């Protein structure tokens, strides 16, 4: 992008700015596959139908579970100090994402558990997001994602009419102002029981790209007489713009 517009004195030329490429987010598709075999003897003993039905359901469940784990991996491994990095070379959730104009943060400056104070601070921090040239983009949170351990905390924070955890007769500002219009969802594949995440309205954030959809194949093996089944798909989960998501790893 460009910096702020410049005042043009009367009779002077227009100031020109230069657009710059920042970083490249790379996505490497993974091939996910799994198979099983039913022996020729099992087929002869009339076990084929029963085993095939049970095993194919188990195969589908395994493939679905793998996709869920892969989908959660950027969030699980992108917390401060872990291994998943965005295209700018730092962890997905970082206080110092580099930009042309300086840095920006998509995590709390002081890690905190999910409560009214930390969630309100997250709203303030998201609203302060800037683009590559330091211009404010007026970002806002759209949906919160929590591990199952935080589902009850999230329910109270999002839906109580009054403030939670206090005897003060104050309204629940987060609820009344509609700060998280999409509510919250639970992800059972998060590995940190006290981390919470906020999807923002910044486009090109978290992405799922599919190179080849799930397919299944079956064939007989001449040598053993076994019947073999396999399932296969290719996809990748990643992030293009870290501003698309905000997180706190918990205290």
Describe the function of each predicted region.
Residues 4-8, 14-16, 84, 90-92, ...:
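Polar low-complexity intrinsically disordered regions enriched in Ser/Thr and small residues
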């Amino acid at each position: 992008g460009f910096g702020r517009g410049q005042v043009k004195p009367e009779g002077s030329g227009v100031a020109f700015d230069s657009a710059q490429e920042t970083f490249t987010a790379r996505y490497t598709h993974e091939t996910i596959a799994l198979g099983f075999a039913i022996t020729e003897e099992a087929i002869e003993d009339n076990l084929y139908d029963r085993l095939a039905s049970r095993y194919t359901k188990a195969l589908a469940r395994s493939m679905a579970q793998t996709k869920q784990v892969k989908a959660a991996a950027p969030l699980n491994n992108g917390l401060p100090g872990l291994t998943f990095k965005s295209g700018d070379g730092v962890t997905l959730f970082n206080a110092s994402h580099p930009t042309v104009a300086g840095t920006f943060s998509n995590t709390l400056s002081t890690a905190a558990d999910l409560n009214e104070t930390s969630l309100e601070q997250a709203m303030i921090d998201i609203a302060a997001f800037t683009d590559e040239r330091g211009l404010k983009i007026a970002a806002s949170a759209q949906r919160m994602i929590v591990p199952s351990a935080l589902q009850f905390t999230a329910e109270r924070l999002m839906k109580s009419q009054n403030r939670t955890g206090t005897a003060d007769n104050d309204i629940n500002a987060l609820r009344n102002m509609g700060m998280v219009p999409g509510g919250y969802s639970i992800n059972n594949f998060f590995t940190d029981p006290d981390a919470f995440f906020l999807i923002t309205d910044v486009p090109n954030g978290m992405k799922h790209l599919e190179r080849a959809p799930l397919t299944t194949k079956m064939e007989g093996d001449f040598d053993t007489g076994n019947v073999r089944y396999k399932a296969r798909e290719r996809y990748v989960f990643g992030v293009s713009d870290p501003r698309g998501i905000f997180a706190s790893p918990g205290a």
